[in-house]
Amino acid sequence: MADKNSEIIEALERDWRDALCSKDVERMSALVHPDFILIGMRSTGPFMMHRNEWLDAIQKRDVESIELEIADAKAFDKMLVGTVYAKWRLRYLGRVIEDCVVLTDVWVFEDDRWQAIRRHSTPSPSGGCTPA
């Protein structure tokens, strides 16, 4: 998918990925809106994590790699919604974790920049890391 919306979301997602992998807290803080919430599913059940909690938790992880594929992108005035397939490999609390997830990211344009205000993360339904 090579339309303008996909290109914008792909650039934002790459920037976010690069900030995560390099533990660039300043850049991550700039990319996530003050009202950011991560909503997801773990083996223990559903969870919600607000911005400061997420920024704190992400610093305890060593992200080795994140592969991204933009499956869909939609634009609405000052909002973008992206569906992203991601394959993560990270170390957290001494364990290596590999996971394939589908992300729904909602970006808002405020103060002359795009910021993620919501991220929903769920295990990939196909068990793979690409659209079915």
What are these language model-derived features?
Residues 89-98:
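Short, cysteine-centered beta-strand-loop-beta hairpins and adjacent loop/turn segments enriched
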